[in-house]
């Protein structure tokens, strides 16, 4: 890819988006029984921050959790950054899920797209978001959270920002959890 100033002048096209690797769930996590698993479509997607701010799910990492053959089906929420590369990685993960080429015992319930900056995303990003909206049961967008840049731990900010609170509420409704 060539970059002139802040404009991309050439885009490297891969034949297919990269698949998300699969990693067996360690035996010591056998006692963990989360409502769902946060799965990053790439490193730095924001799963641990969303996990801390919402207090929901289990942040597994940038790979599919692989469960034992006799396991029940586990729900997953995919997370990516609102960048061309982040959404390309999300396209690969969603494609794996749709084609059933990823691990068994995993059901994708949606994709959370986390802003990469406070600026309006480029056209390629908004186009990929629109495409993925048709491929996943749910798609949420979380805006840029400037306050998190100064936080040692996401929960240090106190109440979650409004769009994160709305995401939490939507997830609770999705999984039919009574809200207190």
Language-model-detected regions and their locations in the chain:
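Inter-motif core of Ras-like GTPase G domains
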Residues: 62-82, 97-112
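Beta-strand-loop-alpha "switch" segments that mediate conformational coupling across diverse proteins
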Residues: 129-157
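Short, aromatic/basic amphipathic alpha-helical patches
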Residues: 51-52, 122-135
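Short beta-alpha junction loops
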Residues: 112-119, 145-147
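Conserved Switch II/interswitch segment of TRAFAC-class P-loop GTPases
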Residues: 75-91, 116-122
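Extreme N-terminal, non-catalytic leader segments
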Residues: 1-35, 169-178
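C-terminal boundary of histidine-terminating zinc-finger modules
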Residues: 153-168
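Glycine-rich phosphate-binding P-loop
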Residues: 34-58
């Amino acid at each position: 890819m060539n970059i002139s100033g802040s404009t991309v002048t050439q885009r490297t096209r891969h034949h297919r988006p990269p698949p998300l690797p699969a990693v067996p769930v360690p035996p010591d996590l056998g006692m963990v029984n989360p409502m769902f698993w946060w799965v990053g479509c790439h490193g730095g997607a924001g799963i641990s921050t969303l996990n801390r701010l919402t207090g929901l799910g289990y942040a597994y990492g940038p790979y599919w959790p692989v469960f034992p053959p006799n396991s029940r089906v586990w729900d997953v929420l995919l997370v990516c950054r609102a960048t061309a590369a982040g959404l390309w990685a999300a396209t690969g993960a969603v494609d794996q899920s749709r084609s059933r080429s990823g691990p068994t015992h995993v059901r994708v319930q949606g994709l959370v797209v986390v802003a990469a900056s406070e600026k309006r995303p480029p056209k390629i990003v908004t186009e990929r978001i629109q495409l993925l909206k048709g491929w996943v049961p749910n798609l949420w967008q979380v805006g840029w959270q400037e306050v998190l840049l100064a936080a040692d731990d996401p929960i240090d900010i106190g109440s979650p920002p409004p769009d994160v609170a709305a995401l939490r509420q939507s997830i609770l409704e999705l999984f039919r959890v009574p809200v207190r």
